[in-house]
Amino acid sequence: MSETLKLYFDYKSPFAYLAAEPAFALSERYAIEVRWIPFFLRIKGPSQRSQYSDWKAQYSYFDARRWANKRGGFAIKGPLKVYDSAPALIGGLYAQRAGFFRPYTEQVYARFFRRELEIDLPDQVAALISALGHSGDAYLAYARDEGPAALDACIEEAHADQIFGVPIFVFRGERFWGHDRMPLLEERLAEHGLARADTAASPAG
């Protein structure tokens, strides 16, 4: 029987983007179900940050691109503003309900970090959902009605799990922060006998 592995994510995080592809592959190698939980990452604007924070932000995107280059060089462009990712995160919850979460998530990350998608605009999220063959209007209705409360419930769960950033995996109460901690996570899954016998488990990278 599969165990549940929580993954807290935000579409505006380059490191959550780096974790996405290997996270989708985990269930192929381990007897787990990855439960993707949106988390609203609060980022200060330029006027609220210190010089040190600016340097850290610049380095973070440089480092994310360095990791992306090791995996074929997909685009990770820095954002032109601080984004309210709630419309896209609610879109993720809608996509989970409607059964197209993976293609939705892959497209949101890729388009956002190519600066081709404004994740704070519900109409653009709806257009993407329509392009994926699903109902953009149904998403907009969900975003007006049930979606905000569903996202709030995810944030409350994140607080209970002491989540402070993304990506964070939670396995049996143990947190693993960052895509570069995935090899440690995989070691823990293997220690608990969750590696699939028909698949050679290799560390994510």
Q: How would you describe each model-predicted region?
A:
Residues 11, 15-112, 196-205:
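Structural alpha/beta surface segment adjacent to cysteine/selenocysteine redox centers
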Residues 4-6, 10-32, 107-205:
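C-terminal cap of thioredoxin/glutaredoxin-like
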